Structures are given as C-alpha cells and as structure tokens.
C-alpha cells in the first residue's frame, strides 16, 4: 500500500499533474502500473481518511494544553521507533508540525499495513499530511526541504 501512496504522490500530487478524479480511472491506471487491486483499494481508503481529517465542523484535536507532551501507545512505539519519534519531536520543536498535524501523521502511520516504519517513509507520510492540511503550506515547504536537501556532515537530522 505504501508503494501506491508514494507512486500517487510522486506522479500526480508532487509533480503538480492534476489527479484523476474518477476512482475507476485511477484504479485502472494503478493496475496498469502493476499494483494489485486489494492494495489499490487500501491506498485509496487511506487517502480518503486523510482527506476526512481535514473536513468536518470540528478540528481534528479539541482542547489540548500547549504544555502537554505526547505519550506513545505500545502499538505506536512498535510502528514508530525511537528515531521516528525523535524526528516527530524535532519537527514540533522547529514548528514544522503542531500538535494537530503530529496527531494526523500518527493517525495515518497507524493505518499503514507496514509493521514498522523507517524514518525515510515517515518523512513521506508527514509530507502527504502537510500537503493535505490547509494553511500549512510553509510547513510543507520546510518539510520538502528537509527531504530533498543534501545532508550536511554533523547534522542531527536530515
């Protein structure tokens, strides 16, 4: 499923090509690209749920204290190793993520069928969430820079 999400993001969203609106046409395109029907449906559902996080009358998170900190569940810690959790904290500290977008990222990570996520894959999930979060264009650009810039020697995070 993650491969399909990456394919869609790189070939449609990130390249600024208009995404096919018709789900049947998109499914046919993905099938022609070599993806299996069941994985295509999972990926499309994942994207629909991402879009749903942005919709509705209520914000994704209500009533959070700015001085609170995130305690990860056992399942979240299995999916997101120390490096990934540290990177999420780093992104919050440098204001790329806020509490709401961090929780959206964790929500989307937990819906992936991967048993654990590596840091590089987490970065792409973060990019997808920020791309779909209205009003977070600057954070998206910062995250894009973090993904595509060449790492410098001695840097803590790339």
From Swiss-Prot:
One of the Pfam families matching this protein, by short name: DUF494
Record-linked InterPro entries: Smg
Domain of life: Bacteria
PANTHER family noted in UniProt: PROTEIN SMG
Protein family membership: Belongs to the Smg family.
Protein name: Protein Smg homolog
Organism listed in the record: Shewanella oneidensis (strain ATCC 700550 / JCM 31522 / CIP 106686 / LMG 19005 / NCIMB 14063 / MR-1)
Biological classification of the source: Bacteria, Pseudomonadati, Pseudomonadota, Gammaproteobacteria, Alteromonadales
Gene transcribed to yield this protein: smg
